[in-house]
Design a protein with these regions (language model features):
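N-terminal intrinsically disordered, cationic/polar leader segments
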Residues: 1-94, 98-173
């Protein structure tokens, strides 16, 4: 049975943080680090652009539910970030990218290890008034966005597991 919709009532737009990452910065990991440093636990990624190398993005293949087949596109050379959006909930980064290289455009779910090539400029908006987190959905095997009353976890830190790449690894076992 598919997960139910989630609506977080009472959310308010907070302050906006504009970030420029530099050559060699890890995109996903830097976003998480900046949110921790700035104490902004819940964020909407408004926009972002720049260039990356050591790229890894994942996505779903096929129409079946729950998803069982995934692609993982990796590029060691430079690609341009055309668009970037997502939600950071309890410091857990869930970001999708539209990218291009000389062969054309493609996209997917941002995975760890993607390095900034020349720059990445990103606008983040804090979400106030609600507590957001990601919880494991047993049907999809993914961590889905939820409105929660508490941030308590077993080790006190958010679990970054739950990307499509992680789900695909789990299914291969």
């Amino acid at each position: 049975m598919p997960a139910k919709r989630m609506i977080a009532r009472g959310a308010r737009a907070g302050g906006i943080v504009v970030v420029r990452l530099a050559y060699g910065d890890l995109l996903l990991e830097s976003l998480q680090e900046i949110c921790r440093e700035q104490k902004i636990r819940n964020v909407v990624i408004l926009t972002g652009f720049g260039s990356l190398t050591d790229l890894s993005v994942t996505g779903v293949v096929g129409p079946e539910f729950p998803p069982r087949r995934f692609y993982n596109r990796q590029r060691p050379r430079g690609v341009e970030i055309i668009a970037m959006s997502g939600v950071i909930a309890d410091y857990h980064v869930h970001c999708h990218l539209v990218l291009c290289d000389r062969r054309g455009a493609f996209g997917g779910h941002l995975e760890p290890g993607c390095r900034v090539l020349s720059l990445a400029e990103i606008a983040l908006m804090r979400v106030d008034g609600v507590k957001l987190a990601r919880r494991l959905d047993p049907t999809t095997g993914q961590k889905l966005l939820e409105s929660v009353t508490s941030y308590a976890t077993a080790n006190g830190r958010p679990d970054q597991e739950g990307s499509l790449h992680t789900v695909a690894r789990r299914l291969r076992r």
